[in-house]
From Swiss-Prot:
SUPFAM superfamilies: Thymidylate synthase/dCMP hydroxymethylase (SSF55831)
Predominant cellular place of this UniProt entry's protein: cytoplasm
Species assigned in the record: Lactobacillus helveticus (strain DPC 4571)
Domain of life: Bacteria
Protein residues bound to (6R)-5,10-methylene-5,6,7,8-tetrahydrofolate: D223, A317
Binding-site residues for dUMP, renumbered to this chain: R25, R180, R181, R220, S221, G222, D223, N231, H261, I262, Y263
Listed GO MF terms: thymidylate synthase activity
Pathway: Pyrimidine metabolism; dTTP biosynthesis
Protein name: Thymidylate synthase
Keyword match Acetylation: no
Length: 318
């Protein structure tokens, strides 16, 4: 057995000791380090953090949402996944149709004002339920624009039509595995202004050698405490799914980050996490009867032997 999260723990420690203080668009402030890389050997296990509980069900449903080409949070809510709620909710409360309580700067205010947080949580609950119950409302306010699902599966071409980058890269892996063009990108400068959140994981590239497939992700911005553990598990899962469809063994997940940062209101949580001793990493189970990415459902993907420490809560910077 192996402790696969060690590169993540090492990077957290590096940012804590060597990071630079920076302001950011959320107004929270960060401790930031530019140009970091972590490597995870997926043949040794699955790099789901053990130093805190990471809800794997959310990672599964989010990745399947991306792979469906979906950009509406309704699918996520149907699977009790609230990762993207705040960005859709922001579009709703900033619209002319919203007539509820003032939600200006709801992210920061909900952290500092307990009374406002109660109002915010009630409004968010009503919003989520309306997305589930009202199809027209969901189409208008549940859609996040040109986020990952759109860019991966429906990249719009200038001359009309679209490119399915996932299908194309799988075809390349099968037919020309030595290619240096096996890339999927989510960064389209034209779409950045219309996205709820411009892509943080900008592009990823596959590499095949000796019957093994690896992937390298370039992430422009990484919330090290909340977001990056999800990204590590999500791209490791994606690589396993691609390996299954292409008949290859899994190699490495290489995670390259631009601005790797710890929010100032996460510093205590990071200290607590770093004080914990990691357990052996779990193993990933994929339904052996499924071969194609499109056929996988939630029940076909599991982690086994997942021993972990308790949850550490931290606020999301929106």
């Amino acid at each position: 057995m192996a402790i696969l999260e060690q590169p993540y723990l090492d990077l957290l420690q590096k940012i804590m000791s060597e990071g630079h203080g920076k302001d950011d668009r959320t107004g929270t402030g960060t401790r930031s380090y530019f140009g970091a890389q972590m490597r995870f050997d997926l043949s040794q296990g699955f790099p789901l953090l053990t130093t805190k509980k990471v809800p794997f069900g959310l990672i599964k449903s989010e990745l399947l949402w991306f792979l469906r080409g979906d950009t509406n949070i309704r699918f996520l809510l149907e699977h009790n996944n609230h990762i993207w709620d705040e960005w859709a909710f922001k579009n709703w409360v900033n619209s002319s149709e919203y007539q509820g309580p003032d939600m200006t700067d709801f992210g920061l205010r909900s952290q500092s004002d307990p009374e406002f947080n109660k109002i915010y949580q009630a409004e968010m609950k009503k919003f989520d339920q309306r997305i589930l119950d009202d199809e027209d409302f969901a189409k208008k306010y549940g859609n996040l624009g040109d986020v990952y699902g759109a860019q991966w599966r429906h990249w719009e071409k200038r001359e009309g039509g679209f490119i399915d980058q996932i299908a194309d890269v799988i075809k390349q892996i099968k037919e020309t595995p030595d290619s240096r063009r096996m890339i999927v990108t989510a960064w389209n400068p034209e779409d950045v202004p219309t996205s709820a959140l411009p892509p943080c994981h900008v592009m990823f590239q596959f590499y095949v050698v000796d019957g093994k497939i690896s992937v390298q992700l370039y992430q422009r911005s990484g919330d090290m405490f909340l977001g990056v553990p999800f990204n590590i598990a999500s791209y490791s899962l994606l690589l396993n799914l691609i390996a299954r469809e292409t008949g290859l063994q899994v190699g490495e997940f290489i995670h390259t980050l631009g601005d790797a940062h710890i929010y100032r209101n996460h510093l205590k949580q990071v200290e607590e996490l770093l004080s914990r001793k990691p357990y052996d990493s779990p193993q990933l189970w994929l339904n052996p009867e499924k071969k194609n990415i499109a056929d996988f459902e939630m029940k076909d993907i599991k982690v086994v032997d997942y021993q972990h420490h308790g949850t550490i809560k931290a606020p999301v910077a929106v």
